[in-house]
Design a protein with these regions (language model features):
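Conserved ABC transporter NBD signature motif
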Residues: 56-64, 73
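The feature captures the beta-strand-to-loop junction immediately N-terminal to the Walker
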Residues: 33-35
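Helix-to-loop junction immediately C-terminal to a conserved catalytic motif
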Residues: 48
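Conserved lysine of the Walker
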Residues: 40
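Conserved beta-strand
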Residues: 4-7, 15-25, 56
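ABC nucleotide-binding domain signature
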Residues: 31, 71-83, 87
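Conserved catalytic loops of ABC-family nucleotide-binding domains
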Residues: 126-140, 147
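Short coil-to-beta microelement around the adenine-binding A-loop and adjacent beta1/P-loop entry
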Residues: 14-15, 71, 121
């Protein structure tokens, strides 16, 4: 499970996301949805312990992310960054390599960018299968990308500056 409790994310002087809370349970895909520039990438970085929260805390399996060392976080979580050079094959390689070591959570930052519909569906199916195996899967994506996932196994958190709503 990945959780964010009362988190506030600031960039410079601007509150990007304010006072947000959500739970990404094991067994579900949780989509963090919002328009470009709304703070999805900063939110992902905060979940990974790479961007500080001005307020609140993020936890992974009940442990505050800020108390976990970077090597320990890498043992617990697979991160699929937005900037992968060769889209689908690299995204799947990152997943497979990370999961071979027993990691229990996946966080992906806009992984469908520049992918064809067919490739996006393949990646979404793989992420959905990982959730079905009991992993917490968090995907920052656009509203259109949510359609790649089975709605009965997906939670959607709509990001609206400076807040978030979970449905």
């Amino acid at each position: 499970m990945i959780e964010l409790k009362d988190g506030r994310i600031v960039a410079g002087e601007r509150v990007v996301i304010g006072d947000l809370s959500f739970v990404a349970p094991a067994g579900k895909v949780t989509c963090l949805v919002g328009q470009r520039g709304c703070g999805k990438t900063l939110l992902v970085r905060s979940l990974l312990g790479l961007w500080p929260l001005e307020k609140g805390f993020a936890t992974l399996q009940g442990e505050p992310v800020t108390r976990l060392s970077a090597p320990w976080l890498r043992r617990l979580m697979v991160y699929v960054p937005q900037e992968l050079p060769d889209s689908l094959s690299d995204a799947l390689d990152v997943l497979d390599e990370g999961l071979a070591t027993g990691r229990r959570a996946v966080v992906a930052d806009d992984p469908f960018v520049a992918m064809s519909e067919e490739r996006a569906l393949l990646l979404a199916n793989r992420l959905q299968a990982l959730a079905g195996e009991g992993r917490a899967v968090v995907v920052a994506c656009s509203e259109a990308d949510v359609s790649h996932f089975d709605p009965t196994a997906t939670l959607v958190c709509q990001i609206e500056n400076p807040s978030i709503r979970q449905s």
